[in-house]
Amino acid sequence: MGNLSLFLKKNKKEKKNGYYAATKSLCDDNGKPLEWEIKALTTRETDAIREECSKDVPVAGRQGQWRRKIDSTMLCRKLLVAATVFPDMHNAELQDSYGVKTAEDLVAAMVDNPEEYNNFVEFVQEFSGLESMDDKIAEAKN
């Protein structure tokens, strides 16, 4: 048998935050894209976000049957907000400057280029240890 004390939380290695330039449209004085501080999301965090973005909907033509539906747009936005340490997506001044009232709308306004947005989502998923959507699609095709 192994040493159970090695499994205690105090022995668990924590992943350090990373940095990612989410958009080329926000740059420093030298024209270099600003790096955002990103944390890896935990299983509990991703589960809670997935649950928050899910709802039961009736199955068409099948009375009394329901299926689970995920709002994938909101799921991605909430994952980005939860993973972003800096800039603070909940900052009222930042939200006001973009004319939005929620952190989820702010991240979409700040990273408004679809390709950059998709790359940001993929980075956060991979940094957090989640499979990217491309990986899941490729796996499903095989």
Locations of regions flagged by a protein language model:
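Low-complexity intrinsically disordered segments
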Residues: 1-16, 134-142
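Generic alpha-helical secondary structure signal
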Residues: 11, 23-24, 102, 121
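Short acidic-hydrophobic surface loop/beta-edge motif
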Residues: 16-31
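Short, surface-exposed, charged amphipathic helix/loop patches that serve as local interaction elements
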Residues: 30-142
